[in-house]
């Protein structure tokens, strides 16, 4: 059987437009491996084009024979229907100049639905309204374990629930915030719409107001000595109940150098960006960034994090903090112009041969964004040294973007994943690589990078071997059952729109997926829209945030 895949959020009139026909590469599927003629029809029932579906070989990650239908020259907005040579309908898609603008609003609004510590009122949340949650105080881990009487209580309300659980994690928060803040700074025209959040209609763009809600919570994770707690969770994940029904004791887990460095970096970034609207807050977060940095300098050795015995909430473990320190040095230097930060920037950059990643495990690419695009305050004598750093970042981004293009070029679905790279959160890898492609395009203007970034979003939005749009409630076949305690518990048939789910995982670790996915399933098809499958179908803030960046990038030329 021939299957049809298109971007379910829509294609831009002036953009790359490729749909895919696919068929399993089996002996009993004997479709001739030759080009096919396909006709395209508009909403009025008029034939607008005849295209060739060009045979492109077998995609090894999907084990599909694939054909490509390139209709990039079609610019008329509206619904496009595809028919085969016998007049049978293959499928349809839309062309709209608002495709990515609308998508971006949905992706951003999803973060509002992750808010903790406040009621989500019907005015803003509609049918997904819910009551206030997690308003109690927290205690330090050591006091909790010792059952210390009269333990010091910490007020840590606010922020976003990180994922399908109710924990809040410093490194994850900092990464997501950076993606979103940089997206607004680079592509402000994509963030002009009212998101219908409580802060709407003030002078600040709504996306920055949403980030501010998370930043104000993140400030509370810093201790008196400048250190930053790694996470705020209960000892074990909550049951599948609504947030307001989760009454477990919240615990502040010990500081890590990764958390302190990420905190310093994102607070320095925030101090630059929020100076226009919230000057007092900007000064506060710059001071917090400096205090976190000073603590880091007093602790030059890596201080990692491991969950204590009996704890099953997210660990966000790492083996090095050099990339986090690099990011912190870059943001603080760009923000303050203090040459001491440049010294450290140079030192840390020497330890990283490929500073391009922008996920929570490796944030070195975020240092590159700061150095290449941030507002720079520096003395003339430092200019040459800083330019050397900039050149290293620039070349690293371009080299990595070329590698990503090479991977996508040999994929029948144009996705920048090798057969071995379909692991937990594979969609995050796709989106982070799309961010790198976007940066490469910003640096060079080369169309190849923009087209490949578009191809990655096509994959996320339905041009893949499962046919799913991996964004909840976006598209004709979108994920409806994410691993999300709110969605499972709210007794509402519809799912909250706008969450990116983890995606195919050829080595799932949850019991349901291990049972339902057979060992011989091709990697790209190792996906189920089943809420129990947390290693396939969970959500998290830092899977939405790169999607926001890439959607805004694509929207800028709509």
Where are these regions (language model features)?
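Carboxylate/His-rich catalytic cores and anion/metal-binding grooves
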Residues: 205-227
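Zinc-dependent metallopeptidase catalytic helix centered on the HExxH motif
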Residues: 357-359
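Acidic, glycine-anchored loop motifs typical of Ca2+
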Residues: 199, 203
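Proline-centered turn/helix-capping motifs that create local helix->coil transitions or kinks
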Residues: 222-232, 300-305, 337-340, 406-409
């Amino acid at each position: 059987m021939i299957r049809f895949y298109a971007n379910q959020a829509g294609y831009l009139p002036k953009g790359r437009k490729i749909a895919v026909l696919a068929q399993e590469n089996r002996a009993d599927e004997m479709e001739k491996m030759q080009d096919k003629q396909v006709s395209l029809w508009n909403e009025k029932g008029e034939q607008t084009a005849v295209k060739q579906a060009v045979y492109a070989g077998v995609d090894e990650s999907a084990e599909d024979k694939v054909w490509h239908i390139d209709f990039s020259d079609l610019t008329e907005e509206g619904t496009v229907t595809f028919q085969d040579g016998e007049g049978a309908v293959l499928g349809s898609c839309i062309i709209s100049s608002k495709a990515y603008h609308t998508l971006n609003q949905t992706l951003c609004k999803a973060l509002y639905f992750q808010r903790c510590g406040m009621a989500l009122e019907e005015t803003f949340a509609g049918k997904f309204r819910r009551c206030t949650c997690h308003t109690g105080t927290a205690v330090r881990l050591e006091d909790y374990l010792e059952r210390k009487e009269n333990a010091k209580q910490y007020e840590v309300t606010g922020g976003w629930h990180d994922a399908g659980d109710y924990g809040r994690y410093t490194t994850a928060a900092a990464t997501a915030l950076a993606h979103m803040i940089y997206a607004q700074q680079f592509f402000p025209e994509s963030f002009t719409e009212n998101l219908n959040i409580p802060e709407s209609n003030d002078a600040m763009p709504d996306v920055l107001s949403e980030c501010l809600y998370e930043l104000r919570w993140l400030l509370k994770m810093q201790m008196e000595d400048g250190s930053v707690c790694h996470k705020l969770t209960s000892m074990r994940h909550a049951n599948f109940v609504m947030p307001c029904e989760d009454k477990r004791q919240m615990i502040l887990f010990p500081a890590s150098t990764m958390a302190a460095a990420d905190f310093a970096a994102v607070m320095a970034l925030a101090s630059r960006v929020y100076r226009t609207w919230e000057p007092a807050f900007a000064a506060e977060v710059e001071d917090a960034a400096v205090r976190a940095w000073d603590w880091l300098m007093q602790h030059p050795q890596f201080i990692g994090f491991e969950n204590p015995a009996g704890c099953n909430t997210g660990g966000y473990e790492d083996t090095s903090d050099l990339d986090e320190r690099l990011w912190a040095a870059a943001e603080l230097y760009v923000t303050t112009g203090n040459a001491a930060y440049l010294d450290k920037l140079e030192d840390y950059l020497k330890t990283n041969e490929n500073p391009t990643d922008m996920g929570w495990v490796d944030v070195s690419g975020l240092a590159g964004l700061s150095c290449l695009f941030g507002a720079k305050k520096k003395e003339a004598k430092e200019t040459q040294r800083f330019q050397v750093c900039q050149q290293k970042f620039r070349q690293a981004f371009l080299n990595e973007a070329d590698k990503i293009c090479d991977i996508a070029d040999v994929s029948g679905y144009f996705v920048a994943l090798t057969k071995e790279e379909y692991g937990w959160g594979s969609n995050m890898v796709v989106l982070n690589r799309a961010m790198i492609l976007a940066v490469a395009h910003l640096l060079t203007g080369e169309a190849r990078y923009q087209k490949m970034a578009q191809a990655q979003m096509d994959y996320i939005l339905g041009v893949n071997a499962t046919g799913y749009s991996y964004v909840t409630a976006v598209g004709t076949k979108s994920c409806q059952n994410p691993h999300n305690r709110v969605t499972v518990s709210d007794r509402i048939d519809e799912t909250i729109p706008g969450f990116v789910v983890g995606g195919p995982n050829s080595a799932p670790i949850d019991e349901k997926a291990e049972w339902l996915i057979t060992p011989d399933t091709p990697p790209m098809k190792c996906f189920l829209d089943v809420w129990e499958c947390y290693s396939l179908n969970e959500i998290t803030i830092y899977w939405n945030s790169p999607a926001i960046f890439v959607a805004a990038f694509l929207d800028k030329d709509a």
